[in-house]
Amino acid sequence: MTPAGKRILVMAGGTGGHVFPALAVAKYLAQQGWQVRWLGTADRMEARLVPQYGFDIDFIDIKGVRGNGLIRKLAAPFKVVRSILQAKAVIAEFKPDVVLGMGGFASGPGGVAARLAGIPLVLHEQNAIPGMTNKLLSRIATQVLCAFKNTFTTVKAKVVGNPIRQELIALGAEPKPEADEALKVLVVGGSLGAKVFNDLMPEAVAILSQQQFVTVWHQVGKDNLTGVKAAYQQHGQDGGVNIAEFIDDMEAAYRWADVVLCRAGALTVSELAAVGLPSILVPYPHAVDDHQTRNGQVLVEAGAAFLLPQAILDVNKLAGKLQLLANDRTELARMGQRARDVAVLDATEQVAAVCISLAEKG
């Protein structure tokens, strides 16, 4: 097994789609005796989340430049140089055996600093279309990994899936319970909620409930609880609906659900596959390069999900898809199995194995 005392610098931040897969790898390597340190930014979610998992984190000063104003773009090169120097200082002090970049602003300067120091750089891209940072770093990385086929077209990349929590992998292996009479719909719109779900679901459930028992667990996002609850009440549907700003225990939510209505973020798609749940995917229309549509195609092509572009989504289309699933529980179960069939369940171990191999060669 891995010799104790090896060191890895993990770079991931900004969103849960970057941070949680990186945490899965970090936890795995820490259990093997590795010393883990994190590189991130002080104003994003990693600053709060990473220390909760027991890992030390260093911060550099860097922000995105895509879509920003002229002055910020002109100043960007100077800020990038400064952030590379900050990352070099962290690397010089920590002396990692390998550096793992999994997306977010800090990965760019940190990746450049790692290669300048002669340290192996492993990249992992979670989305079907690479972000700007990983696209640039892929040219200098020692090893490029990705979750989906054909993500990178100009460099060789190994497809390993997305690292996810072991609890969800175990959940997907559990026998599925007998279906209740009521269709159980889990609605997840991210930490801020999804306005389109909050607007359409109350009326869609009212339409559906005329012919079918349905219960809903709806995560509405910050500050949306009162308004969405009132909308369900207005449509006479407050009895069978559990409304929450956040769902802290996604394992429990996935275990409860028959079908999930959600966006098509990379981590969400990978989790749906791992737990074996059918889904209705509505990609976030403003995602960079429309990468969520590409993410969702993996489940759609497997026959495990429906994909509805937000531009054409309305109450009747949403109610119709839910009715279709409610009326054919056999097909619903098949969709769940197809989702599980395309899951990559050892992504964490594969990413860790690459890091271990490069560290040992060094």
From Swiss-Prot:
It catalyses: di-trans,octa-cis-undecaprenyl diphospho-N-acetyl-alpha-D-muramoyl-L-alanyl-D-glutamyl-meso-2,6-diaminopimeloyl-D-alanyl-D-alanine + UDP-N-acetyl-alpha-D-glucosamine = di-trans,octa-cis-undecaprenyl diphospho-[N-acetyl-alpha-D-glucosaminyl-(1->4)]-N-acetyl-alpha-D-muramoyl-L-alanyl-D-glutamyl-meso-2,6-diaminopimeloyl-D-alanyl-D-alanine + UDP + H(+). Cell wall formation. Catalyzes the transfer of a GlcNAc subunit on undecaprenyl-pyrophosphoryl-MurNAc-pentapeptide (lipid intermediate I) to form undecaprenyl-pyrophosphoryl-MurNAc-(pentapeptide)GlcNAc (lipid intermediate II). Disulfide bonds: none annotated. Pathway: Cell wall biogenesis; peptidoglycan biosynthesis. It is found in: Cell inner membrane. This is UDP-N-acetylglucosamine--N-acetylmuramyl-(pentapeptide) pyrophosphoryl-undecaprenol N-acetylglucosamine transferase. It comes from the Bacteria. Belongs to the glycosyltransferase 28 family. MurG subfamily. Pfam families: Glyco_tran_28_C, Glyco_transf_28. The keyword NAD does not apply. UDP-N-acetyl-alpha-D-glucosamine binds at residues 15-17, 127, 165, 191, 247, 266-271, 292.
